[in-house]
Swiss-Prot record:
InterPro entries tied to this protein: LCL2
Signal peptide feature range: 1-21
Function description: Probable component of the endoplasmic reticulum-associated degradation (ERAD) pathway.
Source organism superkingdom: Eukaryota
A GO BP annotation: ERAD pathway
Keyword rRNA-binding: no
Protein name per UniProt: Long chronological lifespan protein 2
Entries under PANTHER family matching the protein: LONG CHRONOLOGICAL LIFESPAN PROTEIN 2
Record's keyword terms, sorted: Signal
Length: 122
């Protein structure tokens, strides 16, 4: 007679502990707002340009401040590419340059394709 209530209590305990474990799993998986000891959550980048504006305004440069990298250079076409490991800088002449994806081409291939496109051949 005592076995039935004890079994019911034990079953209820197992269901509650399983549900709690599932909620903890989903909370951790989806970055729930609970405080976790030992884990620092990185702050998400803002969707507005306030950080960029503050950094731009706080940067000291007496020459030209590159808008993409905030590098201080003598001329705009001297600006480095933001991602040099995957981009190639192509000078267009007239003091301007663009950064293009390397895309697996051989060295100088991007510049050649841009020049052909400028001539209307490509």
């Amino acid at each position: 007679m005592l076995a039935k209530p004890l079994t019911a209590i034990w079953t209820l305990f197992l269901l509650i502990s399983t549900a709690q474990a599932q909620f903890q799993f989903f909370e951790q998986m989806f970055g729930g707002g609970g405080s976790h000891q030992g884990h620092q959550q990185e702050q998400e980048a803002s969707s507005d340009s306030s950080w960029y504006q503050q950094t731009w305004e706080g940067t000291h440069c007496t020459k030209y401040l590159c808008p993409d990298t905030l590098a201080c250079v003598h001329f705009p076409h001297h600006c480095p590419c933001p991602h040099p490991s995957v981009e190639e800088k192509v000078e267009l002449g007239e003091g301007s340059a663009v950064c293009v994806s390397r895309g697996g081409w051989t060295a100088g291939e991007a510049a050649r394709k841009i020049e052909l496109a400028r001539k209307g051949v490509l």
